[in-house]
Amino acid sequence: INCRYNYFSTLNLTGLTELFEIDCSNNMVLNELYVPDSNKLKTIYFENTGLTSIDLTHSPILNWVYGGFNASLQSVFLKGSPFVIYHLNQSPNLQYFCVDESKVVTAQNYVTQLGYNCVVNSYCSFQSGSEIYNIEGNSVFDSTNTSCNTGGTGVPNMKVQISSGTQSAVLTANNLGEYAISVGQGMQTLTPLLENPSYFNVSPTTQTVSFPATTSPFTQNFCVTPNGVHQDLEVAIIPTTPARPGFDAFYKLLIKNKGNIQQSGSVTFTYNDAVLDYLSANPLATTQATGTMTW
């Protein structure tokens, strides 16, 4: 459907589920656009409009989103479209961009390059024009049950679920165990998630915070302590490029302590020296022989 250069203030297309392309660009009075729940919609243009917010979360096969030159645009909801390419240039008032968890880093880099002061996450709780509140904290592992408040070791990449009503998302902490998210007003519930929950105790097990009643930023830390003694070491090899005859192949060797006590030892990587030639390793192996490397 092509409705460029029109004077609609509201455009409701919710019943047109067979649409594969929408173009409503250059419509400066358009401030409400209702997009259909469609498994066929692939492309949408809404450049140079008066829109403040657009929800595209019900169009799972979207490939192209053109939303540039929108001075009033504050929020874009694009979660649920894993293969989409978007253009949001010249929309400097964009405050919130909701995408799939796997796309958060890419989307954040994109809006940063554009110079926007924009929150990007997979938690679609923010409403256009509403106040933004911040939640932050860290997760600390205390092996002796004594040092959570005085130090301890950050739990890298620990996951924290956040939910509000029907909306939920999972945050992943950084290498130091630190996490942060921006949310809209209302009740928010934080729940730490562990890969092996029977190995650990976490305090608190859940935390609820309500905005604007609570001052922003709100800090919530989690203390993780061992529950019994569990040895659980995982070793995996991950190819990062396809193995092709005559070409270099790259692999990552991942050693992960999934238990709750410190472990030590060595790991040996064995390969078929008849068909593979060793080139390099980082870090260098402690010992090396034909077809084997040990760290």
Annotate the PLM regions:
Residues 135-142, 177, 222:
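A short, amphipathic beta-strand motif
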Residues 236-265:
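Short beta-strand elements of extracellular/lumenal beta-sandwich folds
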